[in-house]
Amino acid sequence: FVDAMSRMMSPYDFNPLNINPLKDLIERFVDFEAIRNFDQLELFITATNVHSGRMRVFRREHITADVVMASSALPHVFRAVEIEGEPYWDGGFTGNPAILPLISTNGADDVLLVQIAPLKREDTPTTARDILSRVNGISFSSSLAAELRALVVGKRLLRELLPGLECH
């Protein structure tokens, strides 16, 4: 039912009052102050700016319920979430996950990536639901693939510019 509705109506049509019980639960059960103050671990959440199409990475210190909601706002199901006057959708469109901030901010030697959606599929989707699912999968995976390619190119350039440098 929701699947069919989301193809015929936008979330602005079928949820005119913008009621979202998930936000209420997040605000009630997540201690954002504790998250912001916990400096033993870095946390980044990504959202996609609707106007520019660019990724915005929110660091641990700036994470709020709105940031969490924006980072998971699929545009065919949820309204864009406004943060500082700008509308945001799911961060998966532009950074799924955003790897470069982890490396550039922390100088991490290693990053563990857990892939939750396959980049490749052997079957050809034939139903409307499967086609939409695959389109979303490709869209969400393309940002990761682009970042991985950028890392490979960066390592290659470093090796050429600094022959004695060891890159893993």
Language model features with spans:
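Non-catalytic peripheral regions of patatin-like phospholipases
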Residues: F1-L25, T48-V50, R59-I63, E86, ...
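Active-site glycine-rich loop that binds ribose-phosphate moieties when present
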Residues: K23-E33, A65, M69-A80, G91-I99
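A short alpha-helix-loop-beta-strand transition element characteristic
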Residues: V30-E42
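Short, structured loop/turn "capping" segments at alpha-beta junctions
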Residues: R36-N37, F78-R79, D110-L112
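A short, Trp-centered hydrophobic/proline-enriched beta-strand micro-motif
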Residues: L43-A47
